[in-house]
Amino acid sequence: MRPIAHDLPTSIARAVGRVAGRQLDPGQAAWLAGVPALLLLVPATIPGQLFWLGVPAFAAVALVARKVRPGPRTALALLLLLAAGVAFRMWLYGYGWSGVLSVTGAAIDRMRAGLSPWNVGYPNSIPPGEPFPYGPTELAWYLPFALLRFDLRWVEFACSCALLVALAARGRPIGLAVAAFTPVLAMVASDGSNDTSAGIVLLVALLLAKRGSIRGGVGLGIAGGFKFHALAWTPGLVMIGGLPALAALVLASLAIWAPALLLVGPGPILASLRWAEGLHDWAGWSLAGFIQSFVGGKVPSWPFAITRWAGGALVVGAVVVDAWRRRPAALSWGAFLAGGLAIFLVVLYASYWSSHGYLAQVAPILCWEVDDLAGALPVHRLVPASRRWQVASVLQ
């Protein structure tokens, strides 16, 4: 008898392939089922908000995966998905709450006044008194809009809609359907958080990595200056590009952080990070919250500092070992994305407190690539425009 470890992936691939209406190998099936499940079904298990909408949305994505094929009418399907996604975001505009953009606006005001934005409690945060725990890239991203006195939520809304337009223009119906219908993505597009913009910056960084490891190092260095979470893809990048990729990341990071380090020093920045880490005294959207829902009482926070960082270290080790075992063959693009995603999820969610909004940081790259990784074909005549951007990759 063959071991179940051999038969199970093939059986799952056949089942997913039946739903999709085409034959899939286990890797393709994992991407086709895994991305919608992560963004649609996992949040739907959390009580409250409108996350339950992820269940019918998952069915809609399955229908898109089965029905939308290359042909003369597919442009209409893409336009309908695009319109539905924009309408969903308009319906949920302002739903939910986050004080991140309020803090960012106040931090920019302090920076313009010649003061440090770090290690300060901002009264306009939710709840009042939270610090600014982000980097210079975040300040630079929002600065032009803050100077024009825009409501920064509209920046997030525009970025979210721009992603939908780009996915439609590339002819990627599955990624477009996931991005359009995911309740979490529609909510964080205007709830006052900065995760949508962080996801766009990370998308650009990872697409640069697809074009070359040194470019990827520069991109991740810049993205890490927005939120440190982007550095989850560093181990895979270094295993691909070696010391040149690492040097590019370090130099880009130094260029981003040098003005802040020279003007205010590392102390206030590190203090803001420690301050932000200790703000939340309740377990939610995390491993601790999952366990607490079963035990019925409050769980202590200290074990989850261990699970978070020890688990992250184990995943980093697994990524490095996997990449080393593949040598001299290069790490595949799918394996590179999956390794960084695993580090990202473990470090952020095997913790005491986390946020549903963090999923918006990885959603753009997943929606951008899921059609290709699942073996789907672009579906309309704008394909030549997409091909011009399909450059040779070091991730073979």
Where are these regions (language model features)?
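Bacterial/eukaryotic Sec-type N-terminal signal peptides
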Residues: 1-2, 396
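Primarily membrane-embedded glycan-assembly and transfer machineries that use lipid-linked glycans
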Residues: 2-206, 210, 214, 241-363, ...
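Transmembrane helices and adjacent periplasmic/lumenal helix-loop junctions
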Residues: 218-239, 352-358
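Preference for long, amphipathic alpha-helical scaffolds in soluble/luminal domains
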Residues: 220, 232, 256-257, 383
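A juxtamembrane structural motif centered on a specific transmembrane helix
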Residues: 370-396
